[in-house]
């Protein structure tokens, strides 16, 4: 969700828009990979159904809001370093995801610990369930989230000077993760199959990986997950020497 944070929601967005109107920050481009959760192997039906057909965007005051804020400021830093050629970012992100969803299933399966922690756990959870069971679990989860959102909104209305983080510490954080189901993007290797595949023939000069807190409950596996993720992406992009920059949170707590 940190990479997914859009420029339109960032503190300095209006300032950026004003400068774009003055034709500053030219030669910057972005492409947002459609966030495909699932492709039915039998019918080819894509979930969600309302995805837009994407294209390259030459950044201007009208479309800058939808680029990743981190992606934009990375491009800006490169441009201000003296690069005069066009600079482009391909936004391939989905908030609330484990590193395991971006790694090939065959790669996860090769490591006994990762196979047990991610693949086996997933398959054990969904075993023997029907689509009606999955829908029932999802409905119950959604009702829990809706109640949480109502409680949070009520608290913030009663305490308008309270920050969102403080309010969440009192009311509780958004219930997460949702229950596993075969068409949910949080399943192991899910977004490797539906999003990373969309750029497998692209040519890139560097990759930036930002991991939030989603793997904190399985932190002991991260020394295996991270190298495997880098291996998977380099292999998929046919570039064994692709530079990878790691932008990590220094720590996480319910402050």
Predicted regions and their residues:
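Cell-envelope and extracellular/periplasmic
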Residues: 1-255
């Amino acid at each position: 969700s940190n990479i997914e944070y859009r420029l339109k929601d960032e503190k300095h967005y209006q300032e950026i828009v004003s400068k774009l109107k003055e034709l500053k920050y030219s030669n910057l481009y972005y492409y947002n990979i459609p966030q495909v959760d699932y492709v039915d192997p039998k019918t080819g039906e894509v979930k969600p159904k309302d995805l837009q057909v994407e294209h390259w965007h030459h950044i201007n005051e009208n479309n800058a809001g939808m680029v990743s804020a981190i992606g934009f400021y990375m491009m800006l830093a490169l441009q201000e370093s003296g690069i005069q050629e066009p600079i482009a970012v391909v936004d391939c992100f989905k908030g609330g995801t484990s590193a395991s969803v971006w790694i090939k299933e065959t790669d996860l399966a090769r490591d006994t610990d990762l196979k047990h922690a991610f693949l086996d756990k997933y398959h054990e959870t969904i075993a023997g369930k029907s689509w009606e069971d999955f829908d029932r679990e999802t409905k119950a989860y959604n009702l829990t989230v809706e109640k949480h959102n109502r409680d949070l909104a009520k608290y913030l209305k009663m305490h308008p000077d309270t920050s969102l983080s403080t309010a969440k510490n009192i009311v509780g954080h958004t219930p997460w993760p949702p229950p596993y189901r075969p068409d949910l993007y949080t399943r192991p290797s899910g977004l490797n199959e539906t999003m990373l595949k969309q750029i497998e023939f692209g040519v890139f000069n560097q990759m930036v990986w930002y991991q939030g807190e989603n793997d904190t409950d399985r932190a002991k596996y991260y020394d295996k997950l991270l190298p495997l993720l880098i291996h998977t992406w380099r292999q998929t992009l046919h570039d064994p020497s692709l530079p990878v920059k790691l932008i990590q949170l220094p720590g996480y707590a319910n402050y």
